[in-house]
Amino acid sequence: MPTKDKDLTMNTHERGGPSIVAYLFALPPVIILLVYKVVPFITALILPFKEYELTKGVSGSAWVGMRNFSDLFNSPFFTKVLSNTVTLKLEYIFLCSISAFLIALILGFIGSKFWQRVFSTIFLLPYFMPAAVFIYLVLYAMSNAGMFFMYSTESLMDPETFRLIYPILEAIRNIGIPVIIALAAINGRRAVDNRGFLHTQLIPTLKSIGLFALIQLSTLLTMDYEFLSYLQNPTIYETADTLDTFVYRTALMNNEFGLASAIWLIKYAVQLVLSILIFFLIKRFFIKGVFPSQTKRAEGIRKRGSFVGVVLSFFVVQLYLLLTTAPLAVSVVEVFGDGSQISQASSDLLSGLPLHSSFTTYAIGITFAVLVNMVITILLAYPLTVKDLPGRLLYTIFLIIVLNMGMGGVHEYLFFRGKGMHNTILPYLITGFFTLANVFVIKAIYNTRYVSVEERTVKGVEGDPESFVKRYLPRVVKPILGLGALQFAFMWNSCYPGQLVYLADPNKFSPVMIFRNIIMGAQADVYGQLAFDVIKLGAAVSIPGIIMLLFIMILGGHEIFTAQIWKN
């Protein structure tokens, strides 16, 4: 007997195949993309060929042809920052991929999904706290270096040592993402396959880590600016200066917008080519391994697990805690022991900060931005789920082009400044509307997990309003909720570009930005006398992100974490 879903498919086919009405659902968000992404992008194509002056604007500034590119390629600084960017990125990808592969393989031996979630949540904790808090705790522990750390804070003043420390710290913070993706792939494969270790564990893990590494390669010339900025100082620019930090200094500190735009355009062109190539490579070889179909369960499936796997997992987690959480916890205990002596100094530091109003304002603002983001994601993803829809390839390429525009470029800064939004939180909220990586995650989850083989053999799979409401929406509710929680955590924990670039008024800063300014300020002893209250504040500003993590782990569907790979 045909299923209800199959009847929907047949009815759509009888009405004439795939309906281009699907594009009408995507039209409103596409218009928003054109206004807030494509229009500024046109400026990005012009700026590299002009000597931009703020008083004259883009149209009034003089054309200089290829001079900005000539100056760039003749500059020894560009060659150096390009080399640093590629080196640090590749070191991070290699270290994180190898470590995640081994950890996921070990955790995969645990048959209980509950214990898998417990262990994997531990690895995800650093990612869901603000980078400012994570780095502060690391630096505090290093400033009181003992048995847990080989390096002290003075090590960060040495260029060669920094090249070793940075990839390790970034891998520690982000390793939970590929691990949770691999575990989701393992469990998904076990639900439909009753074969052995090779097919149900090793291959899904390899494909998941391969997916992670490939997506990271598609952003080869982009680093996590905010994370890097907390560790960087002029004494280590030799190895620590990257394209992102160089552009930030060149544009916003030296007002060399044309030169900075030339760098951005080179980055964009290289990463666009890489992204298109890697997209089709992933689609061909990796998607089904990471997002296996669960429309049919294999016969004889039983939960697999082993005592040895649980023991190994326990020791791996203990080692991770020893290397990361333990020294931080020891530091917290030391600080709490001296807390009674510093209340007045901390009061002087924290007095006058708009913490309560900031929490309220940003919680409401981010919630609104996330809701808009979820609606935009649902509508943009719908045409990608319609089989044989005319023009779908061009639509896909358009989304990849916009995805690679990223955020925080000089052109976006000038766009929002021109609209009178400078020194407001509006750019911060508006840039949060767009996470096009989420669109491809929804598409991959829906097409591989929720559409049966029988439906895919029928030409002309949906695309009309009835299918959108009755079939598509119910199946994407769970992943879109998870992606929304991820977006909330990402926005809450981030200062760049929304605040570092657009905000100058301290009264409008987010709680995380307030925390950042405290630990970056030279006027206070935040690693000594004031550490007690700084750590308490760090714990407070980390709470929303941790709540989002717990919500996602309870919700399940952890393939959604692939959306975060584009942000790392």
Regions found by a protein language model. Give the residues of each.
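A structural signal for multi-pass alpha-helical bundles of membrane permease subunits
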Residues: 18-290, 309, 313-459, 463-568
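Flexible interhelical linker loops that connect adjacent transmembrane helices
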Residues: 286-306
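Short, Lys/Arg-rich, polar N-terminal cytosolic tail immediately upstream
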Residues: 1-17
